[in-house]
Amino acid sequence: NPNSIDSKYALKPFDMTWVDGGRYAILGPSGCGKSTMLNIMSGIVKPSEGRLLFDGVDVTDETTSDRNIAQVFQFPVIYGTMTVYDNLAFPLVCRGYDKAFIRSKVNEVAEALSLENLLPMSAKKLTADQKQLISLGRGLVRDNVAAILMDEPLTVIDPDLKFRLRRKLKEINQKYQSTLIYVTHDQNEAMTFAENIIVMDEGEIVQVGSPAELFDRPKTTFVGYFIGAPAM
């Protein structure tokens, strides 16, 4: 609440360009502003100052539904009374697409996510990682999605499955050329997933760079220790 006398801004001023089709991680400790940045992009939170542009168009005042953004939250959001197929089809059904198109897109995305054998199953019977894949799949079925925003999406996933899911996310990025923005406080997740990492601390972007750049040339002591760079 920046209008309060004693309050601090959740995010300090910054100017950031996200390249279409890129794979990003927003990395930093809890409470540093990562989720706030993500929620401003999706439209859940409106910034008190500044503007947000999509391909040069100002969308700061646009609703979430008008931004063509998909968001995957920390805990899977699924419809337990529906089948896996119906969960994946739901965004298209709501937008009035015909059944043949819906079937084609759902089957395509289910195959990409290795969910094709689960389509007839009740979604409530799935494991946590399978439910999170459904959340991701609902973003992928829409052709007009500009970016998929993920807020610590692997928190509820067993450690032995995390690497497999990060690899699957990379495959999705390459197949669909979707912009993926991934919030995490886990250095290993960021370093093994992203092409570019945005390191944050106390509402400020401290450094932006590839995993190799951050590891070899950290700009600050904070970045060095947080990344685990040998130079520090």
At which residue positions do the language-model features occur?
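Conserved ABC ATPase "signature" C-loop
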Residues: 127, 202-203
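Conserved ABC ATPase signature
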Residues: 122-126, 130-132
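Short coil-to-helix segment of the ABC ATPase nucleotide-binding domain corresponding to the Q-loop/switch region
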Residues: 82-91, 122
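ABC ATPase NBD coupling module
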Residues: 58-70, 75, 94, 99-103, ...
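Helix-to-loop junction immediately C-terminal to a conserved catalytic motif
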Residues: 42
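ABC ATPase "signature
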Residues: 208-209, 217
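The feature captures the beta-strand-to-loop junction immediately N-terminal to the Walker
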Residues: 27-29
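Conserved ABC ATPase "signature" region
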Residues: 58, 93, 100-118, 170-171
